[in-house]
């Protein structure tokens, strides 16, 4: 009488587990990088929100305006997001007139100081992204950035010569 084989052998199961382990070895670091990049992108959104404040302050010849005061309705020079804190920094340089020149105003984003607390990726916690505002109003990566290049959003990445 023939016996029918049912199920998988131990060797077959071990091979499947090994394949899953190899796939996970590649997938988990890639996923962690993806999470860090998406969290770092929030900083550029915060900086975009500060553009209006910078434009208002530039009418007074300065990058930074008065500090926040809820009593008087002054919104201040910083914006806190889920993963980071963006602050307006720098000194306005009125001599710059070309659209691609930095105007002296900067936005400094510090990751890990947002409302999410410990839910931020360890790959970007405590890192800074400094954005220089150009005369045309756009932002580009500035000096003082210590965020790894692979996490900097392409929209503001410094152009390599």
Curated annotation (Swiss-Prot):
This is Type IV major fimbrial protein FimA. One of its GO terms (cellular component) is pilus. Signal peptide: none annotated. The modification N-methylphenylalanine is found at residue 8. InterPro entries: N_methyl_site, Pilin, Pilin-like. The keyword Transmembrane helix applies. The chain crosses the membrane at residues 8-28. Disulfide bonds join 63-105. NCBIfam families: IV_pilin_GFxxxE (TIGR02532). It is found in: Fimbrium; Membrane. It holds the Pfam family N_methyl. It comes from the Bacteria. Residues 1-7 form a propeptide. The pili are polar flexible filaments of about 5.4 nanometers diameter and 2.5 micrometers average length; they consist of only a single polypeptide chain arranged in a helical configuration of five subunits per turn in the assembled pilus. One of its GO terms (biological process) is cell adhesion. Keywords: Disulfide bond, Fimbrium, Membrane, Methylation, Transmembrane, Transmembrane helix. Belongs to the N-Me-Phe pilin family. Major component of the type IV fimbriae that plays an essential role in twitching motility, natural transformation, and protease secretion. Its main location: other. It is a single-pass membrane protein.
């Amino acid at each position: 009488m023939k016996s029918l084989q049912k199920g998988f052998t131990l060797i077959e199961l071990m091979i499947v587990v090994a394949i899953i382990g190899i796939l996970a070895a590649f997938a988990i670091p890639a996923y962690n990088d993806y999470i860090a990049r998406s969290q770092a992108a929030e900083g550029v959104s915060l900086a975009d929100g500060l553009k209006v404040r910078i434009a208002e302050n530039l009418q007074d010849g300065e990058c930074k305006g008065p500090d926040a005061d809820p009593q008087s309705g002054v919104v201040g020079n910083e914006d806190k997001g889920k993963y980071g804190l963006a602050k307006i920094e720098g000194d306005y340089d009125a001599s710059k007139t070309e659209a691609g020149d930095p105007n002296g105003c900067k936005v400094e984003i510090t990751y890990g100081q947002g409302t999410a607390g410990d839910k931020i990726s360890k790959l970007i916690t405590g890192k800074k992204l400094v954005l220089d505002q150009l005369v045309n109003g756009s932002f580009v990566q500035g000096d003082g950035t210590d965020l790894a290049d692979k996490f900097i959003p392409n929209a503001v990445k410094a152009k390599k010569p």
